[in-house]
């Protein structure tokens, strides 16, 4: 089931990923719980995830906050298997023709973007596009193995 979230426009100049948390705080943009759990039978574990977003007319500002029992980010480079890591996912459909963008980013900011009408056969964004997306993670940007113990981390794009 698709959820719709209105994304507020804020008056701000270009924002770096490292400043997104502060900018969204100053604009009083609150977090919204992510309560859509895909593939629940196959993957019953469900971390707590919240997201908040805004735009300035040129940039979409995204801030995830995740609490989970173990954090992992081993995908070594963009366009890798980030879905096997602690990962945040966003589906955007800017036009009503059935196509959508799927953005997946792990806890270290490693990114995968696909575009298409269904899960299979989506066209992946080239590295030249991925390089234009600034990223910040409270876990740092270097891949890492499992870190056990409940913790909360944030990711900004």
What do the predicted segments below correspond to?
Residues 1-157:
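Structural preference for beta-rich elements and adjacent junctions enriched in aromatics
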């Amino acid at each position: 089931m698709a959820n719709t979230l209105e994304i507020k426009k804020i008056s701000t100049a270009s924002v770096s990923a490292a400043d997104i948390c502060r900018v969204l705080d100053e604009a009083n943009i609150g977090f919204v719980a992510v309560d859509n759990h895909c593939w629940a039978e196959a993957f019953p574990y469900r971390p707590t995830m919240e997201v908040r977003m805004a735009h300035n007319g040129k940039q979409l500002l995204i801030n995830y906050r995740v609490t989970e029992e173990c954090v992992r980010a081993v995908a070594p480079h963009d366009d890798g298997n980030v879905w096997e890591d602690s990962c945040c996912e966003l589906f955007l459909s800017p036009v009503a023709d059935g196509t959508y963008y799927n953005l997946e980013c792990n806890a270290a900011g490693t990114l995968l973007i696909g575009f298409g009408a269904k899960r299979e056969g989506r066209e992946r964004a080239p590295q030249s596009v991925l390089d234009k997306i600034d990223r910040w993670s409270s876990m740092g940007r270097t891949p890492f193995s499992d870190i056990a113990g409940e913790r909360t981390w944030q990711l900004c794009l």
